Amino acid sequence: MGIFITPLWSEYIVSADQGGIFMDHFNVYSDIQARTGGEIYIGVVGPVRTGKSTFIKRFMELLVLPGLEDVHARERARDELPQSSAGKTIMTTEPKFIPKEAAKLSLGDGVEVRVRLIDCVGFMVEGAAGHIENEKERMVRTPWYEEEIPFTAAAELGTRKVITDHSTIGLVVTADGSFGELKRENYVPAEEKTVQELKKLGKPFLVLLTSSRPYSEETRNLAKELETKYEVCVMPVNC
């Protein structure tokens, strides 16, 4: 069974080399469908501790799981959902494709695609926890090196690979500092780095600004500032 998704991102998905000019949403989706053979990989990237994993869980719960008629397939997909929690501690440790098997989504107007989301650690931010152990940076194993490497280096490498090698569309998730224990300014350097990487590659992307008060005037003003700064549309959301 396929899942119908209204074109929520319609005019918001733009290519960096278009200078922020909006495209008709069906033209965007049809073009991506043609270029990718109907397989769309959404790279959910950005700073750590912004709600990337929470967004993926909500996306799956609302758009993917209800469309899985096979109860065993549905339970397997549910078991694959990423962990998420409040606070400063980083929960994600490596890139992960979700669901394991691509889910069919109907975008309307005869456009059908198969979608997978890619979760990743994200670029490090000041104040985050979980990468230091016994006053030293954790050393972790990765699929890319035989030896262990520092957690921060692994997180950066994995995030860049999601952006460069795996994603068809980028979804930059950042935060306004209204929830959790990190301030808005902590996220800015990693946020800028993520946007620069996507623009350099010319990949279509949009920005989600996670907030505990997405409809407030303050949050909407920040979204407008980021739209001007990055020349893409920014959507305030509460995941």
Spans of features found by a protein language model:
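Short, Lys/Arg-enriched N-terminal segments with co-localized hydrophobic residues
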Residues: 3-22
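Conserved G1/Walker A P-loop phosphate-binding module
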Residues: 24-139
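Short glycine-/polar-rich loops that comprise or flank the Walker A/P-loop
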Residues: 113, 166-169, 201-204, 230-233
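Conserved nucleotide-binding/hydrolysis micro-motifs of P-loop NTPases
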Residues: 121-124, 176-179, 212-215
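Inter-motif core of Ras-like GTPase G domains
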Residues: 129-179
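Amphipathic helical hotspot of TIR/SEFIR-family domains
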Residues: 157-158, 179-202
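Structural beta-sheet core signal
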Residues: 172, 207-209
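Canonical P-loop GTPase G-domain recognition
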Residues: 204, 211-239
